[in-house]
């Protein structure tokens, strides 16, 4: 084929970005988690709008494309969110949104069971899909469950369950 009929890359059009992956699991969120998603959407939207309004926006198409992609992902997450009312959760067993204090041979720890996008190990906020949360879900105070970890199974006892407002976490 003649090279005359082949479009040469001109460098002006950015490569199309792959979409950010969306989870196949239900998008359960705590009230705090939904507020965080909405705040992140607003901040990203404001950054995108400011970039579009700037005189240099033509030279920053890659950054604009990244922001647009993130906004599509955030929009999907906000619209698919299933907000869980923590006060309506059964207070006597571990369910989504619970703050659970556990004791083990490694000491006492407190974890909050949250949605996928809220999980933050450094804050002891674990996804409801994690092995720890799966071990705890349904447990009552005094129950001992086995947390299956890569480092080895650990027996943990539930010593407290709390669904108090998590804004102080």
State each model region's role.
Residues 79-90:
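Active-site phosphate-binding and catalytic loops of NTP-dependent enzymes
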Residues 88-151, 156:
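Non-DNA-binding regulatory cores of transcription-related proteins
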Residues 155, 159-168:
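Amphipathic alpha-helical dimerization/oligomerization modules
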Residues 43-46, 80, 134-141:
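Short, intrinsically disordered, mixed-charge
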Residues 22, 45-47, 52, 118-120, ...:
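Generic alpha-helical propensity signal that fires on short helical segments
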Residues 1-77, 166-169:
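Helix-rich terminal scaffold detector
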């Amino acid at each position: 084929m003649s090279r005359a009929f082949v479009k040469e890359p001109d460098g002006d059009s950015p490569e199309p970005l792959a979409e950010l992956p969306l989870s196949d699991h239900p998008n359960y969120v705590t009230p705090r988690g939904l507020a965080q998603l909405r705040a992140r959407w607003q901040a990203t939207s404001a950054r995108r709008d400011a970039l579009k309004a700037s005189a240099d926006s033509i030279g920053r198409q890659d950054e604009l494309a990244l922001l647009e992609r993130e906004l599509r992902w955030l929009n999907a997450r906000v619209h698919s969110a299933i907000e869980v009312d923590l006060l309506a959760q059964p207070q006597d067993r571990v369910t989504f949104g619970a703050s659970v204090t556990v004791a083990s041979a490694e000491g006492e720890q407190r974890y909050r069971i949250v949605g996928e996008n809220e999980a933050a190990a450094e804050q002891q906020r674990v996804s409801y899909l994690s092995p720890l949360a799966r071990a705890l879900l349904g447990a009552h105070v005094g129950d001992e469950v086995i947390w299956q970890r890569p480092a080895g199974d650990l027996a943990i006892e539930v010593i407290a369950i709390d669904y108090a407002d998590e804004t102080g976490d």
